[in-house]
């Protein structure tokens, strides 16, 4: 899978999910906290730059292997 760069559109810590806007202008991608790589509490902040891969999930495309940049 190709690595894609993008920016966090929004992320709800209490629900553990949000959306990332890819930098190539394609459709926003769902992200679940379990796909965030790193130690400690897994969360994202609005406007944060990230790198990720896209995988087809049960409800459409989802971001996986999400790394903060």
From Swiss-Prot:
It comes from the Bacteria. SMART domains: CSP. GO terms for cellular component: cytosol. GO terms for molecular function: DNA binding. It is found in: Cytoplasm. SUPFAM superfamilies: Nucleic acid-binding proteins. The keyword Transmembrane does not apply. Keywords: Activator, Cytoplasm, DNA-binding, Transcription, Transcription regulation. Residues 6-66 form the CSD domain. This is Cold shock-like protein CspC. The gene is cspC.
């Amino acid at each position: 899978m190709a690595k894609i760069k993008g920016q966090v559109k929004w992320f709800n810590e209490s629900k553990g999910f949000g959306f990332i806007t890819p930098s190539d202008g394609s459709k926003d991608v769902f992200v679940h906290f379990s796909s965030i790589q790193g130690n400690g509490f897994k969360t994202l902040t609005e406007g944060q730059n990230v790198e990720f891969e896209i995988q087809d999930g049960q409800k459409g495309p989802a971001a996986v292997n999400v790394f903060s940049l």
